[in-house]
Every structure is written in structure tokens, then in C-alpha cells.
Design a protein with these regions (language model features):
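Conserved ATP-binding/catalytic motifs of P-loop helicase motor domains
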Residues: 1-299
Length: 299
């Protein structure tokens, strides 16, 4: 028995396989009623989207849809900031892309800082966000760009890479990826050497981002730490920052301390806005969606 949704975002391998299988018209049962939408207007809008009637779906939402032009990020952030503290806790901002997510988080954080909801001098961090590259995409030099981080999680990885971390320096004239290892040595890596039949996830590509966190900020984990009850995609609240030590409350209500150089300090990001990849599987009572007409697949 296989269960899947061919409408999943394209970079997800499982979604692609279900789309291919269904294109051959196998015997299958369809579940056309979504249980995630609870209100009548959202049930109607979701049903129209599944039917490919996008214009009609937006029209059914009426005044709930706001066209804000070039100021759509600013208007979205302001809509969330106008909510009561109780409604903020149960309202997510869904963004159509990673750039919009970063901008929305910054705007919301600035608004919270101005009203005193978050406090302190803040702690500047370099965080890592998944590049969402599939195994096949990792075989092409065009997937890599300067400033990214490549993590090799096992020995005898493709291209002779050993376990460790590598900074992506760029692409040379022969299409090889220039990597700098943890000792500072420059290595030329040919991604085409990756065996397409190798299903082991030996490589993980991430993008570096600068984040500032304050006391009271809401963050979201991009990786897990089972021992401390920090689960990927779950949210946590920053309780305090002192002498470089971050004290937070995890989803279970437990207090956790992260000292300087703790690997989980780079595996977090602000959680006021999340993009469409992060939103898969996320269910909220209320939501504010930001989308741009150019982001057709993500919107």
C-alpha cells in the first residue's frame, strides 16, 4: 500500500515518485476531502485549488485577500503585529519563498523590539538553512554557490571527500566545485562523480544566514537533538541571553541552555514566518499567507 500526494512541492523525491506512478493510471483510491481546513470558507478555497481553479479560489475568499503591490511584505508583517498576543501565538505567516521569509521575520522582529515584546542587546548568529537539494541536484555544479556549506556525513564519500565540513568557494572553468576544508585546504570536487544509484545521503548542502536573536524571540529548529528534546521543525522560545549562553524553553516546556559553539545555535531560525517547504505538514488555527504572482509553484 502506498500513500502519497503528487501535488507535493517538486524538490521532494517522494512527491515525484507518486506523481510518476499515478500518471500510469494504476488502481487507486482517492481522498479528495482535506481534513486540515476547518472553516467553510477555507474548505471551499482549498477545494477550488485542488481542482485547478485558482482564480475562483481567491475570489471565494473575498475581502480576506489583500493586494498590496510592492509593499506586500510590509503589509503582511503589520497584519500579524496588529493581532493580540494570544492570536499571535496561534497565527503563522506563510511566505512564498525563502527571501520573503527572511524579510518578514526581520520586519516582525523589528516590530516586536519597538513595542518591547522582545528585549536585550541580542546575539548575532550564523545559522544554516537546508538548500533543499535532491540527490540528483547535488550531481550538478550549478546547484552550488559561493558561501554555502557542504557537510559530508560519512567516509568514502563521492569525489574522495572525507567526513567533515567544507565551505563552497565557487565553480572553476571546468565545472568543478571549489571547496575549502576545515584546515583551510582548497579541494576541487567534481559533483558529476556522484553515483546516481547511490541512495545514501552522504552530502548535505546548507546556506549560511545571519540571524540576531533577542530574549522573547520565537525560533524554529532546522535539525534535531533528541537528547535535549529539540525536534526538527518544532518551535522554542528564547528566555534569556547572558555571557553568550542562550537559555530557551522547548516545546515540551523544558528549559535548555545552549553554550557558545553549541551546534544547535546554527540550527535555528526565527519562526514568525515560514516558507512553503517548512509549512508542509504544519497545521495552524490561523494563518496569514504572503505570495507574489511570480512565485507560481510556491504560491
Amino acid at each position: 500500500v502506498m500513500i502519497g500526494d503528487r501535488a507535493q512541492l517538486q524538490p521532494i523525491d517522494a512527491g515525484k515518485s507518486f506523481s510518476l506512478i499515478q500518471s500510469d493510471n494504476p488502481a487507486m483510491a482517492r481522498i479528495d476531502t482535506s481534513l486540515r481546513q476547518r472553516t467553510e470558507h477555507m474548505k471551499e478555497a482549498a477545494g477550488l485549488v485542488r481542482a485547478g481553479m485558482f482564480k475562483e479560489s481567491f475570489a471565494s475568499l473575498g475581502e480576506r485577500v489583500v493586494e498590496a503591490g510592492a509593499d506586500h511584505d510590509k503589509v503582511t508583517a503589520q497584519k500579524w503585529l496588529e493581532l493580540s498576543p494570544e492570536d499571535r501565538e496561534r497565527t503563522a505567516i506563510y511566505s512564498s519563498g525563502r527571501a520573503a521569509r527572511g524579510e518578514l521575520n526581520r520586519m516582525v522582529q523589528q516590530g516586536l523590539k519597538a513595542e518591547g515584546a522582545i528585549q536585550g542587546e541580542g546575539l548575532r548568529l550564523t545559522t544554516l538553512l537546508p538548500a533543499h537539494a535532491t540527490r540528483e541536484e547535488l550531481r550538478y555544479a550549478s546547484t552550488y554557490s559561493k558561501g554555502q556549506l557542504l557537510e559530508v556525513t560519512r567516509q568514502n564519500a563521492p569525489g574522495g571527500l572525507v567526513r567533515g565540513r567544507y565551505d563552497v568557494e565557487g565553480i572553476d572553468a571546468k565545472g568543478r566545485v571549489m571547496l575549502r576544508d576545515e584546515s583551510g585546504k582548497l579541494i576541487k570536487f567534481d559533483p558529476a562523480a556522484i553515483d546516481p544509484s547511490d541512495k545514501r545521503d552522504a552530502l548535505r548542502l546548507s546556506e549560511k544566514h545571519k540571524e540576531t536573536i533577542y530574549e522573547g524571540d520565537k525560533i524554529r529548529w532546522t535539525e534535531k537533538d533528541d537528547a535535549r528534546g529539540l525536534m526538527k521543525s518544532e518551535e522554542a522560545r528564547i528566555l534569556g541571553i547572558r555571557d553568550g549562553i542562550v537559555t530557551l524553553e522547548n516545546k515540551a516546556g523544558e528549559t535548555v541552555e545552549l553554550k557558545q559553539n553549541d551546534r544547535m545555535l546554527e540550527r535555528m531560525g526565527l519562526a514568525y514566518a515560514i516558507n512553503m517547504h517548512q509549512a508542509q505538514g504544519d497545521t495552524r488555527d490561523m494563518a496569514i499567507g504572503e505570495m507574489h504572482s511570480s512565485a507560481r509553484h510556491l504560491s
